[in-house]
Amino acid sequence: MSSDLISQAESISNIEILRALFITDTHTTVGDVAVPSAEPGVEHDQISPGESDEEIEENISDQNNSSSQKRLQNAQFEALLTRRAEDTSNENIDRVPLNLSDNELSIAHLVAKQDVGGGLLDPREYQIELFERAKAQNTIAVLDTGSGKTLIAVLLLRHVLQNELNDRANGKPHRVSFFLVDSVTLAYQQAAVLRNNIDQNVAHFFGAMGTDLWDRQVWEEHLQQNMVIVCTAEILNQCLLNSHVRMNQINLLIFDEAHHTKKDHPYARIIRDSYFKASPPQRPRIFGMTASPIDTKGDIIAAATRLETLLDSRIATTSKITLLRQVVSRPIEKVWAYDRLESPFKTNLHKLMENRFGNVKALEGVFRFAWYASSELGRWCSDRAWLYALADDVLPKLEGHVNKLAESTAAATERDMAFKEITLIKEASNIVKAHTFNDPEFPGELSPKVRLLQTELSKHFSHAPETKCIIFTQKRYTAKTLHELFTILSIPHLRPGVLIGVRSGDIGGMNITFRQQFLALVKFRKGEINCLFATSVAEEGLDIPDCNLVVRFDLYHTLIQYVQSRGRARHYHSTYASMVEKDNSDHEARLREVREAEKTMQNFCETLPEDRILHGNDHDLDSLLQHEEGRRTFTVKSTGARLTYHSAIAILARYASSLQYEKETTPQATYVVQSVGNTYVCEVILPEKSPIRGLTGSPAIRKSIAKQSAAFDTCLLLRRHKLLDDFFKSIYHKRLPAMRNAKLAITSKKTNQYDMLLKPSIWRRHQGILPSKLYGTILSLLPSEPLSREHQPILVLTREKLPDFPAFPIYLDEDIETKVVPRSLDTGMELSAEELRALTTFTLRIFRDVFHKVYEQESEKLPYWLAPAEPLDANGREPGPRGIIDWKTVTFVQENDEIVFSRDLAPESLVNRFMFDKWDGRSRFFTIKVMEGLRAADPPPSSVPRRRHMDNIMSYCLSLSKNSRARFLAGCHWDQPVLQAELVRLRRNLLDKLTTEEKKIQTECFICAEPLKISAIPPSIASTCLAFPAIITRLDSYLISIEACDELDLVIRSDYALEAVTKDSDNTEEHRGQQIHFQRGMGKNYERLEFLGDCFLKMATSIALFTQNPDDDEFDYHVNRMCLICNKNLFNTAKKRQIYRYIRSRSFSRHVWYPDGLTLLQGKDHSKKMLSQAKHALGEKTIADVCEALIGACLLSGGPEHRFDMGVKAVSVFVDSPSHAVSRWKEYIGLYKPPNYQVRKAEGAETNLALQVEEKLGYHFRYPRLLCSAVTHPSTPSTWYFRVPCYQRLEFLGDSLLDMVCVEDLFHRFPDRDPQWLTEHKMAMVSNKFLGALAVKLGFHKHIKAFSNPLQAQITYYVEEIETAEAESEGAVDYWVVAKDPPKCLPDMVEAYLGAIFVDSDFSFEVIEAFFQAQIKPYFQDMSIYDTFANKHPTTFLHNRLANEFGCTNYCLKAGEMPAIDGMPAGVLAAVIVHNSVVSEATASSSRYAKIRASERALVVLDGLLPYEFRQRYNCNCQVVGNPASAPDIGTAI
């Protein structure tokens, strides 16, 4: 509806506007307003009062864009959640955990354990008689309590189900039987009876299971899976109205306690709104059961006839009364007459309480009962009521009740009164606790009525200790007080209990759950309780075991109460006692009336003609339905769903609930009814997040009709705007922000192959041209301990000057860490052609002698040259650029292809040489010494590595073929010395330590020189050159990462650049997880920088959004920020800039390090291997993570003016959005235009607030109104207090600033900690728990401006608790950990304060750091004390177990809300899913504790499993095939 239309039509009623909007004419005039129709040619909803109109709507399809694996696991969890919601109620009764105590069992198991209804099928003649009648026609069976009405229903059900199965076999549509009950406890009980006697699936549902949220599909599944459904009547009523279930899908409707069918009871609404709306052939059979067809005073015959008409049935009872009396014995009825009671009076305690607290509205009910009890029960009972009405567990409920009433009005006086009431209630509780109660046995303490009850019970239990007794009271307080009294009186053999009804939202100490109610019945059945004080809940339907004494402490008011309560006395020779006051004419009249009414009812039932039909009652039906006239209905033609006045209220409640956002309290629709003349008008106000805020309904003569009419019109308006679907379900599902899952909208699976740079472009530039000038980079090795051989520095000469590289480690000898120190020379050197040729020869000789590769001598094609470097002179100075090269060695190598062996060579000259086998690249040796005791003809010692020829040392060294070997051995010098030598391992990846297999290789050898080549290269140079493959691999990686930075126009230190693009396993992002396909020796990977960059990205975008969108609310900020920082956005930018080419996902390769472009003459060609390695598989999330890591690298690299400048620029590069188009930190200030509220002159109160805070925290506000905004709660009306926006915007900004300052501190303080550790410990620093305690420490709680009394009470309680915790902590800084969670406003205020000082200081991050150092860091100097805050969490353990020990990456931990069951609060189900298997599940009151329990149970299941057993059990192939799933959704430990 347009705003213009609304503004023009303010004076016109909403219903008229609605009619205008729904008419299909081109224009319809409403008053003076012309209302255009919607799209022409489209059929629209038609509304006319008093008629049922229909519509056709287009279906709205849902789009599901999640990945298949996530979708599968989500679907599995949703199915599990639905199943558990059912299972919690429809538990498998064949598997009752009998080893548990009753207190630990659910209601369903308690019912099963008691075997309710077991062995029931033994029908008597009168039951068969009524069964035959019920088969033939709709019937209301009227039989005494205990006479077996349920058995008749079972017989009828079996008959109907048999016919149904036959119909299904003949292809007819499936239909289901519904057994309707009036209470949750009866749903359990009757379902248990049916399951014991019917061999088909029986389900039972009730509202607390969340049935109102089930959609058509869920109901279709239940109808397919079950033949019988037991449920509370309102569930079926709503299903029929929403068209989830249609009347023609039901074959039998059974109404338990059918006398409730009257007025607006769900029984009556089912018949009126759905049953009679269906055509007669589509209506199901009806069977009603009751002990008396009426439960009101008045004309009994008329009431019975009205019941017959409304249920479209005939009342029937048995003609075999004698047989019935044999089965159901009537108790002996007695009257216990007590002396006349005193008039109500005020006890001393009552007077005291009235004088002090008589004006407290919340205690009015207690005052009333205490006044009543003084007469009915006596002085002691009157006073005792105060004790549990003001008990400690009741006080919070009373206070909440007071606050809720206060919040319903905007008057300040009401809120002040509420605060005073809470204080008075606490004071009243203290007075009652201090009061001394008399002994109830003292004279005058109990009323004559209670004294008589005491006397009679003592008599019965002393004469018959096995007595079982039920005492019926009218009031819940009476039952509870009497229970307490008789517990104290301790009558021998009497074991009292209490049974009162469940009443949601009850206060005053009367709360009870369905579970407690049922446990009381179980104990009564077992005899643990033998005297039950009960209200009317025990009268009706509940399967209470035989009693031999029933007492009406408070006399009945209706026939049905009399019949039902008397029916509890089922034991032979039982007594039914009515307590009446002597000389009380009213009591005597009631005794007389119920007996006469019962006789009249019996006569009516017994004299019903056999062939009486209902046709003559049509006029009665019309009269019963007449009051529905004028109440419009609306039907969706496509589905049949119907909207009525009654259903509209429930539909709006569900719609409002669907708007719940994250952890908000459940939103509600608000109804404001006002009188207008002689009529009432209701305004409906929907929650603030609803696109439609509500409307004002039409006038009505009654408040209830006005409310229903407005709700009805609001539903139509929601339909018009497509906010309710074809079943009147909300299109929202407890909606979270749009795109809230954007960060998860990509996959980390290896779904794509991307190009990967193998060599930096610098080697290709100018290749093919002979250089005249070269630039040198010295490679020096600094071992951490002495090496076995000398390693002389070498020089890498390049056409272009190489950048400066950081030092990095390699591992020489037996894993001695050795630092490679590259240093680029500042000036180049001019070289002659001859010098260049000599360097080329030296370089190619290294490749031949050391690496068994012979290249053609093509100087112009070499990408770089190697040369020996001169050592430092005596003064530690290097020679000049030309002098740095050891030309003497270069010349010697150029002039000597090898050192030729001859017999004239002195043996000592063969020591400390580098020798190699020309024909075998595996044989490279460093000679150590001459072995005097060995000859060439001797067999090699047994310790040497095994070779093919082991007959003698000469043959051992020879790798020639058979013929060549024979010729060589015939002509060689057998008298040459034997040398001890070290075999060079084939290992090339010196960037990593030795593997276990490499350590096993024996390197000591004994050789002769003649079969080998003696290299002209000095051993010290050869030793260094053996490390060159690892060194050049690392230098290549540095150069490629620097190219990436150049591509992005970012200046980043080379070590940070490489770290940011290094992915050393398939699942690097899964911190602490067992790394899949781990690449050894790659150095640091991107995970720490990604952690830092992610935090800076969040802060930078938060600042940008805050500065450019001053009118957005926190909700918009969050959503817009998520769109900027989501992985999908980062991935798209990275893909556009081809960042994937620069990512290093492979470690050292033996095939890739060789120079490109040379002609290979001898040796293995690796060009094909290089082509295959030019692609790598990357997940989209990896690429996005690298973007964040590059941001982190920029942050550490600093900037030209501000240390964050390069980080800011990187954020702009990667988010690629106009929302963040800044390249320097100071540009944020230019974007920010201070809003009017900030720059407006501060008033006295605002200045005073700023001064108070400045005294405590030291920061001086230039704009005090920013601070005022930081302490203004969202509940505060905009016209109150400082008239500034609430703190939410500043809190959004401050949250990101706090994250950043904490992350930076941890990052730099703990350089070796992984991101998971950093995250877990950051969680402690930014947790609401800590920030709440800090807010109290800093006194922020005193300054909050809020319009919420509950909030003030919560703050008061929290402050008391946290201050107590601090006082008792003996100086421990982690005292806050043990406290409960604070009200969220307190941590929000701390974050808002940070946002305020940041803005006030012109975006100075230094003020944030100063606050952190002064106020936060002192609590976190020793981070080890917070290890258990998250790291010891079961969820973290589970994550480590699955990822590290089992190598599984395809698992998740899901949590979802469960409906309230057994009268308990709504719970949360959590489940651990591994691949497609649910490993464990658990329920708890919150997601946090459900996840903890599920994780603990999963750890128990996994305990003792070996990895291969795990893989077999859960079909896990993560480790085997190396196909990592998306990042496990394991949840957070906090």
Swiss-Prot record:
UniProt keyword list: Antiviral defense, Antiviral protein, ATP-binding, Helicase, Hydrolase, Magnesium, Manganese, Metal-binding, Nucleotide-binding, Repeat, RNA-binding, Zinc
InterPro entries named in the record: Dicer_dimer_sf, Dicer_dimerisation_dom, DSRM_2, Helicase/UvrB_N, Helicase_ATP-bd, Helicase_C-like, P-loop_NTPase, PAZ_dom
Biological processes, Gene Ontology terms: defense response to virus; regulation of defense response to virus; siRNA processing
Cofactor requirements of the protein: Mg(2+); Mn(2+)
Domain PAZ: 888-1016
Ranges of biased composition (kind: Acidic residues): 51-60
GO cellular component terms attached to this protein's record: cytoplasm; nucleus
Coiled-coil annotated spans: none
Region (Disordered): 36-70
Membrane-spanning ranges: none
Residues that coordinate or bind Zn(2+): C1448, H1475, C1516, C1518
Domain of life, source organism: Eukaryota
Entries under SMART domains matching the protein: DEXDc, HELICc, RIBOc
Occurrences of domain Helicase ATP-binding (ranges): 130-311
Domain DRBM: 1436-1504
PANTHER family: DICER-LIKE PROTEIN 1, DICER-RELATED
Job of this protein: Dicer-like endonuclease involved in cleaving double-stranded RNA in the RNA interference (RNAi) pathway. Produces 21 to 25 bp dsRNAs (siRNAs) which target the selective destruction of homologous RNAs leading to sequence-specific suppression of gene expression, called post-transcriptional gene silencing (PTGS). Part of a broad host defense response against viral infection and transposons.
Family statement: Belongs to the helicase family. Dicer subfamily.
Name of this chain's protein: Dicer-like protein 1
Recorded name of the encoding gene: dcl1
